Design a protein with these regions (language model features):
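General small-molecule cofactor/ligand-binding pocket signal
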Residues: 35-37, 75-79, 130
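Gly/Ser-rich helix-loop-strand patches that form or flank binding pockets
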Residues: 98-137
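Small/aliphatic-rich secondary-structure junction motif
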Residues: 2-47
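Structural beta-alpha unit
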Residues: 69-99, 137
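Local beta-strand N-terminus motif with an aromatic residue
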Residues: 1-2, 31, 95-97, 118
Length: 137
């Protein structure tokens, strides 16, 4: 079975695009399993355990439900901070074959100043990484 990691943030449009990417792959409902992960913010990570459950994140629920409807096996995992390192750790832990990152529209200057989680994952991942853009309206 081909295992894909979907690291989602809090943006529902990006999460929908990531779910649509996976659902559109050949044999998605029979030969693909997905690990959905979310990196909790510092404040969320410091919250009591029952409040920092990744299943409470709206975009995680959205992706899980969308893929469940298509018959795609979904596992959930909580990534640690900083996001890129947490994503890479989850990729290694679950031995994924592919990572499908959501894309944020940011200027080149913004990327240079703030960095890009997707860029860090692309450069450091041991598996192929696809950057999924927003779905057309």
């Amino acid at each position: 079975m081909y295992r894909i990691l979907l690291p989602v943030d809090d943006d529902e449009d990006r999460a929908r695009a990531q779910a649509a990417f996976v659902a559109g792959l050949p044999a998605a409902d029979s030969d693909i399993s997905v690990v959905v992960t979310h990196t909790l913010t510092s404040a969320e990570a410091d919250a009591p355990e029952e409040l920092r459950n990744v299943e409470r994140v709206d975009t995680v629920k959205l992706v899980r439900d969308a893929l469940d409807e298509r018959g795609i096996t979904v596992e959930l995992a909580e990534a640690r901070h900083p996001p890129a390192e947490g994503i890479l750790d989850i990729a290694a832990e679950f031995e994924v074959d592919h990572v499908a990152m959501g894309s944020r529209q940011r200027s080149p200057a913004g990327k240079a100043i703030f960095g890009s989680v997707a860029q860090q994952v692309i450069l450091k991942a041991d598996v192929p990484v696809t950057v999924v853009g927003p779905t057309p309206d």
